[in-house]
Amino acid sequence: MHRVMTIRPDIPPQPDIAAPAEPPARVSPMMEQYHEIKAANPGLLLFYRMGDFYELFFEDAEIASRALGITLTKRGKHLGADIPMCGVPVERSDDYLHRLIALGHRVAVCEQTEDPAAARARKSVVRRDVVRLITPGTLTEDTLLDARANNYLMAIARTRGSAGVDRIGLAWIDISTGEFCVTECATGELSATLARINPNEAIVSDALYSDAELGPSLRELAAVTPLTRDVFDSATAERRLCDYFAVATMDGLAALSRLEAAAAAACVTYVDRTQLGKRPPLSPPAREAAGATMAIDPATRANLELTRTLGGERRGSLLDAIDCTVTAAGSRLLAQRLAAPLTDEAAIARRLDAVAAFVADSALREQIRSALRAAPDMARALARLSLGRGGPRDLASLRDGVSAADKVLAQLSQLAQPPHDIAAAMAALRRPSRDLCQELARALADDLPLLKRDGGFVRDGYEAALDETRKLRDASRLVVAAMQARYADETGVKGLKIRHNNVLGYFVEVTAQHGDRLMAPPLNATFIHRQTLAGQVRFTTAELGEIEAKIANAGDRALGLELDIFDRLAAMIDTAGDDLRAAAHAFALLDVATALAKLAVSDNYVRPEVDGSLAFAIEGGRHPVVEQALKRAGEPFIANACDLSPVPPPFPPPLAGEGRVGAGQIWLLTGPNMAGKSTFLRQNALIALLAQTGSFVPASRARIGIVDRLFSRVGAADDLARGRSTFMVEMVETATILNQATERALVILDEIGRGTATFDGLSIAWAAIEHLHEQNRCRALFATHYHELTALSAKLPRLFNATVRVKEWRGEVVFLHEVLPGSADRSYGIQVAKLAGLPPSVVARAKSVLAKLEANDRGQSARTLADDLPLFAMTARAPVEPPPPSEAEQLIEAVRALHPDELSPREALDALYALKAKLPKAD
């Protein structure tokens, strides 16, 4: 479900979003103020500050009450009807904001901008103003963000090309880190780009939002905001960008096309509006060249579960399996790389070189990882400080970051010739000023509050004026302590206490049994009764009032001086912002390199050979996610080879048991359900993706020619919202592959044609294979239960038949998970159905039907078959299933199936573990 917001300060409020302000005579001054502010911010939930709560009224209250599960009450009347109202405490507002933003809502935060006492003196309502617009794509607070994921705002612009060919300009920013990127693509590539970047919020023009072709897909985004066309005006784009970056021309910052500039300018314009003039520091727009990354369409990303499982969980995804990073920034960078594998051979090699350096030196790797654990999230701390939302702990984060940089540099100095990426990271870590770090260390106290308004974050001795003010404040408090002792002595009440709250200020508190003593002469002349509670009585004195004024003045002066120091330090940090951001990125880069090295060593990954050929040769390939799951269960993963190269590989065939390298760019894979066909398909796609990400891969050897597009058609799901059946979804995805796959593409197809009649499905699968072979000429893996398709290898020279090995023993199917040359003649569907728990009568009946089908011509009519086979009345007399083999018999059969002369040492060890797992469990 998506939400739509319109932020348009330049147009009148829309009556269906904000109720018009009532004439002053009909509403209270406070409600008149509310209507005025609400009308200026249509389409946003208005958090209206009233004391210690943010209140919501009218439709906003009803929406928030449903979304947050909080009580809906009422406050007065409006036009004769009750005013719906709900509220959230200010101190817990971040929790509620996080939930609203996650649901796609936008919020305007309206604060009190003067002291209520000043408003009372003016005999007027407290002044209030909107201080921030919070939208899904413009978050900076840690409490509202996922530390391990980027939070992107994307602008989408379109231009009408010649001959009706449209072009799309895209710009995306993360204001919490300063990242800013742009690119241009064809309309047909938009969905893949959106899936890769996965923006938290997209802004588009009204016209594009309503477009018949692109509008439906845009409205499927998590949050989309239509804006007026002038926001995307390319004629004013460069001027707006120059204004944001405070430069005379963009030539020295970025070379953008007119369309890219329009999208980039829309981004900074929207940021200006939502941040109310405060400008987060952004890097100059980085232009992403067309074809620089592997194109992966949305269906393929979902099917391969790259960053999220089909259920939407991170756990169980490829990212979860390979993420060994120790910093939030490193985790974000790894996710970025996984979403956008490179297609440039040299850039991939540079990443692999960095990983290899840490694979070769385990001691250095662990030293770096230990130091990185102390590196804070500097980029997000910088963004908060620049927007005035930072606190003392953000200052400390930057101090600690520079300190961690020195430790990392000292350890990296052990490398005699650091690879390119590591050398670049070292240079970036040297950039921040060490003088700034020392200044922060001198200024900040050891125990820091979360908020700067709490004070106490400046170290004693840093500034003389602050020290003097603190002494005056603290001395006044000592006077209060002495006064408490004197009052206790004068009244004879040993339990007398002097306390403080925001309502009474300083007051004297005694138990109820002593209250009458202070209210009786002569003590009542000194102690003025203020409040009686269940167990206590409270009093004030003139002397306490005088002391309170002195303490308050000293405390306010001390806090004011601390805030001045904070602003001074924040300004110093802002000046050094570019250097600090470079160091933050260097930490992330080193974290990813060391994390992938740790993964490679612990899970036995190898460095892939990635080149510009069309090769695809994998030995001993494994599925990275499934292998980890089996390892946790104490079971081995059966490795397999795959060769989709146009020529034989340059290295020897794999050892027996790992599978044998075939000779075909298209592999037709047959075998029963649950034998591992889908796992085999996916693992090869994931190995290619990991290799071009710059990671080592789960294999014993791998050579991969650059893959420019990755396609996956696996699994089955309908799309009822669009009126698409499961089969229709399958055909749409297959059509995308056949229309777009190039010779550099890698395609995996699973069970094409199964969602319709047998001969229809067989015909579609047949024609699809021929098209892949003759037209696309790409590398492909095609799994099927249509065994008739294996005959195509006789006429298609680059088609290779492969099968997943199984054994049948005493009516049971044993899955060996080995991929070998050849084809399967059976699918063992009934045996799998039996494993799934179908009733024995159904299994027996299915076997009898299958036997009849196999004994007769497959073209025999269903009516004849129905006449020949007795109905379910015969099921009761169905033969009894033979008992399953005992554990000892299964063990004997497994030993007989082994061929010791064909096993490598590693395979022999795996086989031994597998046999051990079959032993009866001890009681």
UniProtKB/Swiss-Prot annotation:
GO process terms (BP): mismatch repair
Keyword set includes Protein biosynthesis: no
UniProt GO cellular component terms: cytosol
GO molecular function: ATP binding; ATP-dependent DNA damage sensor activity; damaged DNA binding; mismatched DNA binding
CDD domains cross-referenced by the UniProt entry: ABC_MutS1
Keywords: ATP-binding, DNA damage, DNA repair, DNA-binding, Nucleotide-binding
SUPFAM superfamilies recorded: DNA repair protein MutS, domain I, DNA repair protein MutS, domain II, DNA repair protein MutS, domain III, P-loop containing nucleoside triphosphate hydrolases
Span of the signal peptide: none
Sites where the protein binds ATP: G671, P672, N673, M674, A675, G676, K677, S678
InterPro entries on file: DNA_mismatch_repair_MutS (IPR005748), DNA_mismatch_repair_MutS-lik_N (IPR007695), DNA_mismatch_repair_MutS/MSH (IPR017261), DNA_mismatch_repair_MutS_C (IPR000432), DNA_mismatch_repair_MutS_clamp (IPR007861), DNA_mismatch_repair_MutS_core (IPR007696), DNA_mismatch_repair_MutS_N (IPR016151), DNA_mismatch_repair_MutS_sf (IPR036187)
Domain of life from the UniProt record: Bacteria
Family indicated by similarity: Belongs to the DNA mismatch repair MutS family.
Protein function: This protein is involved in the repair of mismatches in DNA. It is possible that it carries out the mismatch recognition step. This protein has a weak ATPase activity.
Protein name as annotated: DNA mismatch repair protein MutS
Organism the protein comes from: Rhodopseudomonas palustris (strain BisB5)
Gene: mutS
